[in-house]
């Protein structure tokens, strides 16, 4: 009967589930009216870049093809199951939000959107990124290895995209998109914490890969993500590949620390990182807009 009746069996995941409930948001909360007026302020190169990023983000879950359900069923835990049910629900909200953004970027032309999505699948930078990650997913045999690859997907795979989108806030453009990016990147930070907790609490130390294997995995992940943004971000307003690489290295070190590993780079985050805007508390007039404050205030993303 213990499998049928709920009993709190993992305090950490029970707390993460509550945190997810408190921070729940919906695609309808993202109003893109002002963003439509900002489109004319983007030059052709910038508009193409952001079309590419959002198309990639909208397709990413299907492209990676990581079976989270298979991973979760490895554990007999009500709280782990409950948390990942909530996480999957939030991923659906992300997908709906990206669909709304693409609808705006392509002016409602579904045929053009589909043709563009099909065309970028031949992009070398995207193919290199997807192929690398698919190879890692396929090569992960043990449970700890699978969780570590999942951790990379949550914590590294989208960082350069989130960073680049956050630069629109620096330019005073796309308030709806920036709010969505704020929410989604914070959700992914929570998902990264969950994957770290899964690794730390649900795998035996004797079964975990060697430290050298883990560091090599993270090192190549940072290289692949850097190459991705380097290939696609050239000539885009404010996109600084060196700063993004610095942020990627700092993020990798933070995640490695979360799973009890030594830092790989010793790199601090860039001084003017646009994602630090996520940590600021905003005073919101209820009658002007919904509050975008997130109950999980991130004091230091890294």
Swiss-Prot record:
Q: Which GO terms describe its cellular component?
A: host cell membrane; membrane
Q: Where does Fe cation 1 bind?
A: 61, 91, 94
- Presence of the UniProt keyword Thylakoid in the record: no
PROSITE patterns per UniProt: RIBORED_SMALL
Q: Enumerate the transmembrane spans.
A: 147-167
Predominant location of this chain? host cell
Q: Enumerate the active-site residues.
A: 98
Q: Which GO terms describe its molecular function?
A: metal ion binding; ribonucleoside-diphosphate reductase activity, thioredoxin disulfide as acceptor
Compartments (UniProt record): Host membrane
Which domain of life does the UniProt lineage start with? Viruses
Ligand binding (Fe cation 2): 91, 154, 188, 191
This enzyme catalyses: a 2'-deoxyribonucleoside 5'-diphosphate + [thioredoxin]-disulfide + H2O = a ribonucleoside 5'-diphosphate + [thioredoxin]-dithiol
Keyword list (alphabetical) reads:
DNA replication, Host membrane, Iron, Membrane, Metal-binding, Oxidoreductase, Transmembrane, Transmembrane helix, Viral latency, Viral reactivation from latency
> Any idea of its EC number?
1.17.4.1
Enzyme class, first EC level, given as a word = oxidoreductase
Function per UniProt: Ribonucleoside-diphosphate reductase holoenzyme provides the precursors necessary for viral DNA synthesis. Allows virus growth in non-dividing cells, as well as reactivation from latency in infected hosts. Catalyzes the biosynthesis of deoxyribonucleotides from the corresponding ribonucleotides.
Q: Which family would the database say this protein is a member of?
A: Belongs to the ribonucleoside diphosphate reductase small chain family.
Protein name as catalogued: Ribonucleoside-diphosphate reductase small subunit
């Amino acid at each position: 009967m213990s499998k049928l009746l709920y009993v709190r069996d993992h305090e950490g995941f029970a707390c993460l589930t509550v945190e997810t409930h408190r921070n729940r948001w919906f695609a309808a909360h993202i109003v893109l009216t002002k963003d439509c007026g900002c489109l004319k302020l983007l030059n052709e190169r910038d508009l193409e870049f952001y079309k590419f990023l959002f198309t990639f983000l909208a397709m990413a879950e299907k492209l990676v093809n990581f079976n989270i359900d298979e991973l979760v069923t490895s554990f007999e835990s009500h709280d782990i199951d409950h948390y990942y049910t909530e996480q999957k629900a939030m991923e659906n909200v992300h997908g709906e939000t990206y669909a709304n953004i693409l609808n705006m970027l392509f002016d409602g032309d579904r045929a053009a959107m589909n043709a563009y999505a099909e065309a970028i699948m031949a992009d070398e930078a995207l193919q290199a990124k997807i192929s690398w990650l698919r190879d890692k997913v396929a090569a992960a045999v043990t449970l700890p290895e699978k969780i570590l690859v999942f951790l990379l997907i949550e914590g590294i795979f989208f960082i350069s995209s989130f960073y680049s989108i956050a630069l629109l806030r620096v330019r005073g453009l796309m308030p709806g998109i920036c709010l969505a990016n704020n929410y989604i990147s914070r959700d992914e930070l929570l998902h990264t914490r969950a994957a770290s907790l899964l690794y730390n609490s649900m795998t035996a130390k004797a079964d975990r890969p060697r430290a050298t294997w883990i560091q090599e995995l993270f090192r190549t992940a940072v290289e692949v993500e850097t190459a991705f943004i380097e290939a696609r971000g050239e000539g885009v307003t404010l996109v600084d590949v060196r700063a993004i690489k610095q942020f990627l290295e700092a993020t990798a070190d933070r995640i490695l620390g979360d799973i009890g590993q030594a830092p790989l780079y010793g790199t601090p985050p860039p001084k003017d990182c646009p994602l630090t805007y996520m940590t600021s508390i905003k005073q919101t007039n209820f009658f002007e807009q919904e509050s975008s404050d997130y109950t999980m205030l991130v004091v230091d993303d890294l």
